[in-house]
Amino acid sequence: MTNETSPCHIFIIAWVCTLAGDYFLSVTQTHLTLGIGLFCVVQTMYMLYLFLCSDTDKKPTLSEPAVRIALFVFLLVVLLVMNMLTLQNALAVLDISLLGYNMFKTWGQGKEMRLFAIGLSLFFCCDICVGLRSILPQEMCMIMFILIWSFYLPSQILIVIYGIRVAFRDRGTFRLS
């Protein structure tokens, strides 16, 4: 990887977008669409990292983007049929599609990405709970709230630890530039 596409830069962009997304979704609870869009950027950064880490012999073929696009379009159609297609919901579907792809991709990358795979899997469980919270009865909201944070906090800790380990491995020392 070149300096322009170093894992350190990719992870820093993802972490900044995560903090900004958390700010809009959790702290202020305003601009929810922007917050979800920022998490789409996070997943895009992780997808870029996975692409750059792929062996040159095993770079994704055209079938991989086709599968992701097909899943995304299918979920959009489901939203349309349910009369729930909004920009916010479309971004949420994009986010969960990207996250699901990244999660499955990391599990296939071997032991060196295990920590990242576990972090993304917990992140996926968190997002599933967020989705369930929006459709479950009000009485279940507190349980979903607890589950969301029970999955989310460990996911972010594992992802940050993994990113720091990558920065040390690739640079010899931890530097942000």
Each language-model region and where it sits:
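Polytopic alpha-helical membrane-helix bundles and their juxtamembrane interface segments
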Residues: 1-177
